[in-house]
A protein has these predicted regions:
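C-terminal segment of classical bacterial N-terminal signal peptides
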Residues: 16-25
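Bacterial N-terminal signal peptides that target proteins for export
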Residues: 1-12, 17
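Compact alpha-helical subdomains of small soluble proteins
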Residues: 70-115
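Short N-terminal segments immediately surrounding and downstream of signal-peptide cleavage
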Residues: 27-48
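Amphipathic alpha-helical packing elements
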Residues: 47-85
């Protein structure tokens, strides 16, 4: 068996590529039954099937879509800060679906022991 290490940025991009479905101007939609970030509640069973990396990508896509300015190396490698507006996560304006979806993702990340 051959083993390869894939850089985190490449892995995150691959996860995003595999998960993204059609992407409207203001929201990402994910395949695998997860749904769109801002127009419906993401089902727990679909979220539980995702890896920790995929959960991180989906959660942070919601923040990116709404103008969060990423500061970590992983965030900067994955998302474009060119049109960001908010340095504080608490100030990022989320609609009710987005707020609930972030909460659901965080809950599943905790259940799975994601970091």
């Amino acid at each position: 068996m051959v083993s390869m290490r894939i850089p985190a940025g490449v892995a995150a991009a691959a996860v995003a590529f595999l998960l993204f479905g059609a992407v409207p101007a203001a929201a990402a939609c994910f395949e695998s039954g997860v749904g769109c970030t801002n127009s419906g509640y993401m089902p727990y069973p679909a979220l539980r099937r995702l890896s920790c990396d995929a959960l991180w990508t989906v959660r942070n896509t919601i923040y990116s879509e709404n103008g969060y300015c990423f500061k970590t190396a992983r965030g900067l490698a994955t998302f474009d800060n060119s049109s960001c507006s908010y340095d504080d996560l608490g100030m990022v304006p989320l609609n009710a679906y987005e707020r609930e979806n972030v909460g659901r993702i965080v809950k599943v990340e905790r259940q799975k022991g994601c970091r």
